[in-house]
From Swiss-Prot:
GO molecular function: L-malate dehydrogenase (NAD+) activity
Gene that produces this protein: mdh
Cellular component terms (Gene Ontology): cytoplasm
Protein name: Malate dehydrogenase
Domain of life: Bacteria
Species this chain originates from: Synechocystis sp. (strain ATCC 27184 / PCC 6803 / Kazusa)
Entry keyword annotation includes NAD: yes
Alphabetical UniProt keywords: NAD, Oxidoreductase, Tricarboxylic acid cycle
Broad EC category: oxidoreductase
GO-annotated biological processes: carboxylic acid metabolic process; tricarboxylic acid cycle
Amino acid sequence: MNILEYAPIACQSWQVTVVGAGNVGRTLAQRLVQQNVANVVLLDIVPGLPQGIALDLMAAQSVEEYDSKIIGTNEYEATAGSDVVVITAGLPRRPGMSRDDLLGKNANIVAQGAREALRYSPNAILIVVTNPLDVMTYLAWKVTGLPSQRVMGMAGVLDSARLKAFIAMKLGACPSDINTLVLGGHGDLMLPLPRYCTVSGVPITELIPPQTIEELVERTRNGGAEIAALLQTGTAYYAPASSAAVMVESILRNQSRILPAATYLDGAYGLKDIFLGVPCRLGCRGVEDILEVQLTPEEKAALHLSAEAVRLNIDVALAMVSDG
């Protein structure tokens, strides 16, 4: 065979659009292409920014020998035909800010980004990363009109990962041997569940004193604020990007992994018409199943309190977009 005449057969090639080329967006793009999860279109409104990042990552390709491609663009038309859209655009919080403080600043950014991206990729699955996470996910669902199973928010994977990291550091254990579960909104009222946390199958309640467990739980709730205070000029982005990448991979490769995500609830856990962090099965259709874990009356009350905090901000966000 003459090698010059060889024409490869066209194969399935996934495409992910990442809206926002800030720290989280660019790191997510890097994770996806370096792990050969998908080709990436990185979009940002700043001229030259996504193009420069994409060029740098394509140069890295020759060093690390991954196959996925990335392009940078300022135009939504270039994102057409994406299988997954991830919204990371928005202002990050600064030291002393809560995630809810970002509501007014990010509502219109998320609404516009979701509308435009889905206009060119109407069959895509939508993942929201922008804070305040649960509210922004609900908002993106409303403005796009997508089926609820095709919209989700990245928070539970991140919150559970932070709790896992703190347990690993406390016990000197391997993080991959640890399983954790955090429910609720991505904020101060999130609900870590220590009794569902294990190390190689052993409940952490048998390994760590109750007071220390409570300290780890509280540190998990404040994990993002702790990092923002240390960085002073920014907030976390490595772990958020890795968490979003895990969700994208489970969807595109139809892995059906059970991961905690901000998911639309229509009766599960006694909650309706809200996006909140719960364990769910992620596959090629998006959220394929919601798992209801057994909660004590106290845990259920705490979950509903977290939901009410999210619900209060949903109406505010919808009004902001409507007024805009």
